[in-house]
Amino acid sequence: MLIYLIAGEPSGDLLGGRLMAALKERLGEGVSFAGIGGESMRAEGLTSLFPMTELSVMGLVEVLPRIPKILRRVKQTISDIETKRPDALVTIDSWGFNGRIQAGLKARGVPVPRIHYVAPMVWAWKSGRTKTLARVLDLLLTLLPNEPEWFEKEGLKTLHVGHPVIEGAASRGDGAAFRVRHGFAPDRKLLCVLPGSRHSETAKLLAPFGETIALLARRFPDLAVVVPTVETVADEVSQAVKSWALPSMVVRGPEKYDAFAACDAALAASGTVALELAMARLPAVITYKVSPVSAFIATRFLGLSLKFVTLVNILVDEAVMPELLQDDCRPDKLAAAVEHLLTDEAARALQAAGARRALEKLGLGGESPGKRAADAVIDFIRQGKEQRNG
């Protein structure tokens, strides 16, 4: 059984890696893989058609210069799928790229089951997107329990498989071991800083984060900074932190979970990492910034409308994690919010309680989402073969 998988960013790559591991557990040597992915998927045996980093871009204006190359990659990917004729295509998140792949295959009549993993946020965007997905997909796998109803009413078979953060290692970090390894005293305050996993994110956030650290240095001269990062942006992050006003250490790979357990608070770009911080019970301030033009287009013309952007807050409909977005992504505001979490135990406890409620809504304590997704893919392929052989 050949499964073709496509991930366009690190969070999708992590999902893809867990899905591949579960498929191998279920099928053993009876499954092989092709497609596009990053370090997690490569670790499970994928040879990526081209570097996933070419697709890791966020923001409407930021993506414009990349469009010609991205469209060439779309054409290349469709051609590769036509040649390989896999038993199923599983695209993971990144609908801007993956939607073009799915639509292109349908338009060409390529006989491959078309599966997408991670639903676009239809409550944030105009709900007409549900019709778009229903036209080009055969099966949709969702992370959130309320999502299937949006798509099933359009006739798209949709299954909720759960959010992978609940099965990850974020809650199992060893903070004491991390402090010993890196020479941090047990009582020294540590701040975890996460400036994003895309170049378009770090380009907007590294500078204000550096200024935030300078402000915090005045209030907490003994504070140390730990910066977990990913391969896509590791070089630029490592270069940027050299000029920060506090001792700043960059860590990569799974050590980030030990870092989460060791730290006292976090400053993070909005994204999947907010859920990981919740799992690690690490109080966090969440921020994000895109170009003003991107923000204007998204709200005015594309119908983006959100009370919150952080999934923890969305799930419980309250500001559990402070959000400082766009014009509020300012060093003075970021520093004040971080200081509050470093010094106010009541605020830390309140955030932990709210985060726990959000995680329970994602299925904390239930069956592994990766295994549920693998079972859904296998069952769908087998059902299709049975119908064709009828």
UniProtKB/Swiss-Prot annotation:
Name its pathway: Bacterial outer membrane biogenesis; LPS lipid A biosynthesis
Q: Does the keyword Lipid metabolism apply?
A: yes
MF GO annotations: lipid-A-disaccharide synthase activity; phospholipid binding
**Reactions that this protein is recorded to catalyse:** a lipid X + a UDP-2-N,3-O-bis[(3R)-3-hydroxyacyl]-alpha-D-glucosamine = a lipid A disaccharide + UDP + H(+)
Instruction: State the protein's purpose.
Output: Condensation of UDP-2,3-diacylglucosamine and 2,3-diacylglucosamine-1-phosphate to form lipid A disaccharide, a precursor of lipid A, a phosphorylated glycolipid that anchors the lipopolysaccharide to the outer membrane of the cell.
A biological-process GO annotation: lipid A biosynthetic process
**Keywords annotated in UniProt:** Glycosyltransferase, Lipid A biosynthesis, Lipid biosynthesis, Lipid metabolism, Transferase
Family membership: Belongs to the LpxB family.
What name does this protein carry?
Lipid-A-disaccharide synthase
Q: What is its EC number?
A: 2.4.1.182
Instruction: State the GO CC annotations.
Output: membrane
